[in-house]
């Protein structure tokens, strides 16, 4: 992933990021640190095509992420800090969402559930936030996306 000349304005007009350039290398682990409200989540959402930069570009495999092409989105998965899960079982969730990720591996997913000591719950919406995160991390890892 390449981020080129990225500008993200604050609501008050001062840029959060002004002309940032960054290359994310495959197989590497990165940390994103900063104060609350400084734009960490905004940057991640832009990297996933969920928000769009004011100026600059974010490319994955040479394609602008903001185009939201299926062949790009199937290679990216984000586990956000805050999220809701629908009132369905984890099996229904997997059935409905794994089709968007061609490298999804159900055996890996089941192993992650076992590692996290999670059951195939009947209603994801009624689980604790900690359990929801474990379910979503299990799904995310099993997608085998590069990012």
Indicate residue ranges for each PLM-predicted region.
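The feature captures the beta-strand-to-loop junction immediately N-terminal to the Walker
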Residues: 33-35
